[in-house]
Amino acid sequence: KENTGFCGAVNEGIRRADTPYVILLNNDTEVLPEFVEELLAAIKKSDRIFSAGAMMIDYHDRGRIDNAGDYYTAFGWAVARGKGKPLAEFNRPCRVFSCCGGAVIYRTGLLREMGPFDERHFAYLEDVDMGYRAKIHGYINCYAPGARVYHVGSATTGTRYNEKKVFLAARNSMYLIYKNMPFLQLLI
C-alpha cells in the first residue's frame, strides 16, 4: 500500500467519522486528564470556532512549551507559538492563526465544508493550511491550555531535523504561500 502521509491518514479517518467533532492526536503524545473535556468545552464556546488546540508540552522538558498554536508571519513563515518557553506564559486561552494537528479538535461538518487536508502537503504545515482556510472562510482557531499533552516530537521521522523533514517543510512553506496568500501580499 502507498504511504499517503499524515494528510492521507487523517483524511481517511475524517471520512469515516460519524461524530460532530474529530480529534487528531499524534502517536508520540501522552494525554493528561481532562484533555477531551477541555477541547470540547473550548470548541463549543462559539459556532464560529473551527478548531481548538491543546497545550503541547515538551516531553523531555515538562516545564516548557512544545506548541501553543501557530502564528503566521507576513513573510509566509509558520511559527510554533511558545516553543521552548515556560508553561506559565501560555496559560490563557486565545485565538491563534492555526492549531497544531498533533493535538487538536475540529468540527467535522466544517472540515467537510472546507475540504479535506491537502494531501499534496503529505506531512508538515498541513495544519497551518487548514487554519488558513478556516480564517478565509471566517472561522476561528483557538488555543485551549486546559487540554494538555506531553509531546516527544518527531518520533515518527526519527529526529527533529532530517533531510526529508527539512525538504517537506521548505516545499510546503512555499506551497502554502502560493495556495492561500492574497495576490497583493505575494507582491511584497
What is the predicted role of each segment?
Residues 140-188:
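Active-site-adjacent helix/loop segment of glycosyltransferases
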Residues 73-97, 112, 174:
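Short, flexible, basic/aromatic active-site loop/helix in glycosyltransferases
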Residues 1-17, 27:
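Glycine-rich, basic loop-to-helix element that forms the pyrophosphate-binding segment
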Residues 22:
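Short aromatic/hydrophobic "clamp" motif used to bind/position activated sugar donors
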Residues 6, 25, 30-35, 106, ...:
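Hydrophobic/aromatic residue at the end of a short beta strand that borders the catalytic acidic motif
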Residues 29-73:
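Conserved donor NDP-sugar-binding/catalytic core segment of glycosyltransferases
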Residues 51-59, 81, 144, 152:
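Short glycine/serine/threonine-enriched helix-capping/active-site loop
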